A protein has these predicted regions:
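Acidic, metal/ion-coordinating pockets
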Residues: 1-134
């Protein structure tokens, strides 16, 4: 199984470049799945619905988030509509979205993508438990 993970798309230029290149990357490396961390794709402040749709339509299979998950308030509802967007698994109960996604590949195999947020020089997932409410 070939998995391509694209780490931290930051801002418009990186996002637009990736969207253009994804089809070539997918065919060149004959990948089974492409996972992209897009928590900084909206100018370094989270992810928007529009950007998520663009990434998924370009060929990204699953999007992961991080500590900027709630910077764009529209994600509070959209993350419930789009299970291919994965927030931290270790957020407390009641936080919108899920921390994992089970993806069935074209050949019937399944892969589970899990996102866990740890901390180093930043707030813990526990102290940000109500960030989605502010």
């Amino acid at each position: 199984m070939k998995i391509i993970f694209i780490g931290d798309i930051v801002g418009k230029q990186a996002r637009e470049t990736l969207i253009k290149k994804i089809p070539d990357i997918k065919s060149k490396y004959v990948s089974d799945v492409i996972i992209a961390n897009a928590e900084n794709s909206a100018a370094g402040y989270g992810l928007t619905k529009k950007i998520a749709v663009q990434l998924l339509e370009s060929g990204v299979d699953v999007i992961t988030l991080g500590n900027h998950a709630w910077d764009q308030k529209e994600m509070l509802s959209y993350i419930e509509e789009c299970p291919k967007i994965v927030r931290a698994l270790n957020y407390p109960e009641g936080v919108p979205g899920k921390g994992f996604y089970e993806l069935e590949l074209n050949d019937g195999r399944k892969i589970i993508i899990v996102q866990v947020m740890l901390r180093l020089f930043m707030e813990s997932a526990r102290t940000t438990k109500n960030a989605h409410l502010s």
